[in-house]
């Protein structure tokens, strides 16, 4: 059995955790946690240490321990602040340890059966702070909110802007 140095194990865990943080990027994030409640790099490292041989390319599949830690972190990394923190941990590890393959880190969720994982390639130059931004819902065009758009010379134009139109469809005919 080969032993892994603590610094290498820490790097792996950090990288995998940041990758898992991407899995919840598409969903709307809840409010940021209270200060001090987000995952620490140490917590992430301990959970994902078994993934190190896989992301270094020394094993063809992640171990059961790796998948267990990855699934747990995927479930716990929900807020934008947690995603930003995990990303920054991964970037630090990737800058420190050159033997970690970012492509393999991105494959951990797929190999471990983590559904809806949409991990982009992990890059040491990405702006992690963008992971904390919640996407906005698109606004309806004014024409759909206030009825047809008319020009300023139309007398109904001002009335439409002041009073939104609500159209109710007629009731369906009753069957005899």
Swiss-Prot record:
PROSITE patterns given in the database record: PLANT_LTP
Pfam families found in the cross-reference section: Tryp_alpha_amyl (PF00234)
Listed transmembrane segments: none
Molecular function in Gene Ontology: lipid binding
Stretches the record annotates as Disordered: 139-176
The keyword Kinase is annotated on this UniProt entry: no
SUPFAM superfamilies for this protein: Bifunctional inhibitor/lipid-transfer protein/seed storage 2S albumin
Keyword annotations of the record: Allergen, Disulfide bond, Lipid-binding, Signal, Transport
Its job: Plant non-specific lipid-transfer proteins transfer phospholipids as well as galactolipids across membranes. May play a role in wax or cutin deposition in the cell walls of expanding epidermal cells and certain secretory tissues.
Protein name in the entry: Probable non-specific lipid-transfer protein 1
Species this chain originates from: Parietaria judaica (Pellitory-of-the-wall)
């Amino acid at each position: 059995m080969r032993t892994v140095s603590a610094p290498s194990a820490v790097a792996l865990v950090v990288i995998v955790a940041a990758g898992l943080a991407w899995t919840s990027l598409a969903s709307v994030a809840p409010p940021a946690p209270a200060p001090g409640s987000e995952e620490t790099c140490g917590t992430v490292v301990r959970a994902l240490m078994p993934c190190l041989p896989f992301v270094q390319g020394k094993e063809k599949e992640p171990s059961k321990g790796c998948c267990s830690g990855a699934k747990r972190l995927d479930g716990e990394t929900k807020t934008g602040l947690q995603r930003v923190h995990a990303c920054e941990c991964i970037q630090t590890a990737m800058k420190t340890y050159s033997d970690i393959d970012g492509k393999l880190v991105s494959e951990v969720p797929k190999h471990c059966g983590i559904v809806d994982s949409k991990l982009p390639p992990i890059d040491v130059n990405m702006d992690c702070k963008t992971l904390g931004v919640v996407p906005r819902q698109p606004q309806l065009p004014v024409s759909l909110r206030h009825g047809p758009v008319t020009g300023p010379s139309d007398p109904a134009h001002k009335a439409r802007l002041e009073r939104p139109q609500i159209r109710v469809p007629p009731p369906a005919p009753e069957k005899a």
